[in-house]
């Protein structure tokens, strides 16, 4: 009886897995390229980024459409400034607010925008790299679809360089499917959620909406920007990074990974539409139900063992396929998905504790309040 119930739950899980990520949003292909003048300023907020910044700046070399590259140095104690200047970027020091109540990435981005000279503003995290010489051009071409207005954002493809980085697998997938634009289950409505690592806006729209000022009390600036743009009827679009835009998250160690995802999920989960969240939960539960079904089948008839093994293989193949859309994760961990599921639950519980009890999270030596 238990095995039968687990089999039914595993079946439901497989169906949910088919529905949570059955719509794709990719940047325009190279065959649709349009030659661009130098119309975009790249703005990079940076705090102690001497290790990651060279990869980003190197990937910007030879890109089409860039007017200038600005690095906003947010009190770095390392060689961030010197490295940026070596690559020809213009570096500005962050001017601290008198009340010191606004700081961090959103503060750096807004000050960067005030220094920019071009019509288009692209905000790029320091851990991002562009996968080929036409990546910026593809983003600009895609933005033309919305007539160079509104907010376009890209979630980079995750390429962890260390084994522990693959522990981020489920979180990366949830970041994409949780914005309600990649599932046929989503209610038809305007999108008010944006990804944070790469965002593109016209400067008129940016200052009309007050840009990153909207995020001065937000942990995830993409949410605040998306809500503001949508509230004034400006389009908000989201895209997968694929081979065009990539990043390596939390290279400083597993502790930074834990802190980073705790910060992200402390406010992110409530943005997902209920029906999509239910489907996500049911799909993730398939990691446990398919595994338990397989383990219990050891003590049952051969036919049951075959069916249980088949369900585990089907779920695992689906699990692997969905995750490889958003990152190059360890195949070992993807196949041993219960390990990833347990780690996900640990972070989610830790995030819930911060959200409802401590009301703050730590990131890069700073404490951020959760509203």
Could you tell me what each predicted segment is?
Residues 73-82, 96, 129:
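A conserved acidic beta->alpha catalytic loop
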């Amino acid at each position: 009886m238990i095995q039968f119930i687990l089999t039914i739950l595993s079946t439901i899980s497989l169906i949910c897995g088919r529905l949570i990520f059955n719509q794709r949003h990719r940047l325009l292909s190279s065959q649709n390229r349009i030659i661009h003048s130098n119309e975009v300023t790249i703005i990079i907020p940076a705090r102690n980024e001497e290790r990651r910044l060279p990869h980003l700046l190197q990937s910007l070399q030879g890109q089409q459409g860039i007017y200038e590259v600005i690095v906003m140095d947010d009190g770095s104690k390392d060689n961030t400034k010197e490295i940026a200047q070596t690559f020809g970027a213009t570096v500005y020091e962050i001017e601290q607010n008198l009340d010191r109540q606004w700081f961090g990435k959103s503060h750096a981005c807004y000050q960067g925008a005030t220094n920019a000279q071009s019509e288009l503003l692209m905000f790029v995290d320091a851990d991002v790299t562009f996968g080929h010489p036409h990546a910026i051009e593809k983003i600009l071409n895609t933005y033309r679809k919305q007539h160079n207005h509104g907010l376009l954002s890209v979630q980079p493809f995750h390429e962890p360089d260390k084994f522990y980085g693959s522990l981020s697998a489920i979180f990366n997938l949830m970041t994409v499917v949780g914005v309600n634009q990649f599932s046929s289950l989503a209610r038809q409505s305007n999108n008010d959620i944006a990804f944070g690592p790469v965002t593109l806006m016209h400067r008129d729209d940016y200052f009309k909406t007050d840009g990153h000022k909207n995020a001065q009390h937000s942990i995830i600036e993409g949410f605040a920007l998306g809500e503001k743009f949508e509230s004034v009827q400006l389009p908000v679009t989201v895209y997968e990074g694929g081979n065009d835009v990539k990043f390596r998250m939390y290279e400083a160690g597993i502790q930074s990974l834990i802190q980073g995802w705790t910060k992200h999920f402390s406010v992110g989960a409530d943005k997902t539409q209920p029906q999509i969240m239910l489907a996500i939960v049911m799909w993730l539960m398939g990691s446990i139900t398919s595994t338990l079904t397989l383990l219990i089948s050891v003590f049952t008839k051969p036919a049951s063992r075959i069916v249980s093994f088949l369900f585990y293989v089907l779920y695992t193949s689906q699990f692997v396929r969905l995750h490889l859309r958003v990152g190059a994760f360890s195949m070992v961990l993807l196949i041993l998905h219960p390990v990833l599921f347990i780690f996900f639950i640990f972070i989610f519980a830790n995030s819930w504790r911060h959200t409802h009890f401590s009301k703050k999270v730590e990131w890069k030596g700073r404490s951020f309040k959760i509203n």
